[in-house]
Amino acid sequence: MPIKFHEGSKTFHIYNKHLSYITCIMENGQMENLYYGKAIRDKEDFSYLHEEIMRSLMAVCVPEPGLLSMQYTKQEYPVYGTGDYRNPALTVRQENGSEIVDFKYVSHEIYGGKKKLAGLPATYTENEEEATSLDITLHDPVMDTDLVLTYSVYEDYPVVTRSARLVQKGDQKIRLENVMSVAVEFPDMDYEMIHLSGAWARERYVKTRKLEMGIQAVQSLAGTGSSSEQNPFIALKRPHTTEDTGEVFGFSFVYSGNFLAQVEVSTYEMTRVMMGINPQGFSWELSRDEEFQTPEVVMVYSDKGLNGMSQAYHRLYRDRLMRGKWRNHARPILLNNWEATYFDFDEEKILNIAKKAKEVGVELFVLDDGWFGTRNDDYQGLGDWFVNKNKLPNGISGLSRKIEEMGLKFGLWVELEMVNKNSDCYRAHPDWLIGAPDRFESHSRHQHVLDFSRPEVVDFIYDSISKVIEESSISYIKWDMNRYMSEPFSRGASAADQGKTMHKYILGVYELYTRLTERFPDILFESCASGGARFDPGMLYFAPQTWTSDDTDAAEREKIQYGTSFVYPIVSMGSHVSAVPNHQLHRTTPLSTRANVAYFGTFGYELDLNLLSAKEIEEVKAQVEFMKEHRDLIQVEGDFYRILSPFEGNDTAWMVVSRDKKQAVAGYYERLNKVNASWMRLRFKGLDEDQLYKVKWEDKCLKAYGNELMYAGIPVDRDYCNKTNGDFHSVLYTIEAED
């Protein structure tokens, strides 16, 4: 078993071949974190890792002559009020106004497999041998409250997952005001913090900062989503860690709402990482026999650099977070009509676009916004999930049938969490809006947020959209969400329960996803939130792909997809070839480069193919054929490697290598041409050093061994780049092992 409890030293050792995580019961009954890092040999006693010394101003939490102080101890789950003056993982308001808590060890359970988290997405196992789990139960006798810390370690991944659960056993009501999912402490501060930051159309840019004493944090208060501004992920890496070497610790939050990821460095250079639901705007009352479960944090340890961390997340999320029919299944090549028509379409126009899509080999046609209610613009119609017969006289059922008769699958866009005031839904249920009755209701994109914290709202939307799906032949649903929450107040909740609203909203979204995916298990769901404002592990549990960004410009997508790959597998990244000039930046990039970027994702088109020249249509046909030939490798069977960062220079490169190292596809992208440019060699990664490969690109072919391709590299033809497409040139390499 990869979790052992050593009774004599009261130590838990959680480990596999990749990592060790060691925690122990201290003399005051609280838990201490002794070590987290590269796997070390198991033994009875690691108590030498506990450090204790008399310091001025410290509060000692054991009888004299003891020296145990929480201020200088690497705690497993720090709380408020017993002498630790750093931020706590847990804040509980009691009936007498006190926030002092003291949870002491009571018992533990070690078991095979991994339990589900009630109402929440989480990683999972399919048999007990895949992982081992540990529940440590702590108890506060004054409140008569249990705190259960849950750990799971996978057998084959460098992963430990963490969550916490509070159970109120006593008669008094307690109010949770801060409940982190995880706290981990490191003995030094020699780290750099990586986070993925941005905004609409420039999501998940890679940011790195050196840790300093004090607090550094990223967060979301968006309410409806994890946000474009900050992704629910951070990593700590050693200063000399690269993409391929060195230590890195990743923390990824399996949640889609408000979050806080915080790193606090003490004046003694100890580093505390905490991650969980953002305490701002959150409070949760527990009465006797009630409990609260936090979402899960997935921690990855890598001693093989950032690529090693990312590949661990990719494999785990692809294999044990995504579920259902589309887990480990290549995605259909689609065409979405949004940038081709926006709201201006009718059945004839849609059928003409779909017909051309079929001619080039596309497999799925997706009808985007504008098909329902009075939805002729974004001022009206949201909430009314019935067909606009003026645009589609034969309804979705008739249109989907005609699309299928062409030999295409049919997909549909929805935005189920939102409502326009100009809608039948709002006129019938004005109290279903999130918003305080005595405050102005802020609007965004002319729409408002439905109160998904209320079960009757979720029921109504479920019934409405299920009817549309049942009556039609739908293979794919794009579930959009186009605004953050403001005035977070539920008209269906009491004053005491308003602090539950934003978390209950996300639980309502999960509930609707659960009901729809269970009722329609064959449908491929893609999540979307004004592009990538809710690209998080919580969504991937229900929808195995996410629209990566509303920015479809190929050059910008290099940055967005590069940053996204730090955590998320490329099969989860919605990526399309769009028209030029690009609709977001008005930039023109070569058709080949647009495809060469989009290949490293789900791949599809977002334009009217009828507007392309005959030569361009032939190029599109070749692109579709290439993707069909290589999508199993790219999306399902391969490991993704980052090679050159768009955040560090003019060039970007990445590649996918099959697990058996027999096949690979690599992309190289040059943003701006340079006059009389210097020589450059592209060094591949992940190949078998002793294997002879055939490399093809453009009109060239080369045979070389893996060690040549990885260490000597392959020259990039700068002159060819200058003579062909000008700026934004790219090269696609296919690599095949020779017998």
Regions inferred by a protein language model and the residue ranges of each:
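C-terminal beta-sandwich/jelly-roll accessory domains of carbohydrate-active enzymes
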Residues: 672-739
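Glycine-rich, aromatic-flanked loop segments that form ligand/cofactor-binding clefts
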Residues: 71-72, 76, 81-117, 245-258, ...
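Aromatic-lined carbohydrate-binding/catalytic grooves of carbohydrate-active enzymes
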Residues: 326-460, 476, 486
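Active-site neighborhood of glycoside hydrolase catalytic domains
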Residues: 393-395, 427-429, 433-588, 602, ...
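Short Pro-Gly-centered flexible turn/kink motifs
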Residues: 98-105, 284-303, 728-735
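Polysaccharide-binding surfaces and accessory modules of carbohydrate-active proteins
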Residues: 5, 9-13, 17, 31-264, ...
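Carbohydrate-binding surface patches
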Residues: 234, 243, 646-689
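Conserved, mostly hydrophobic/aromatic
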Residues: 18, 164, 289, 335, ...
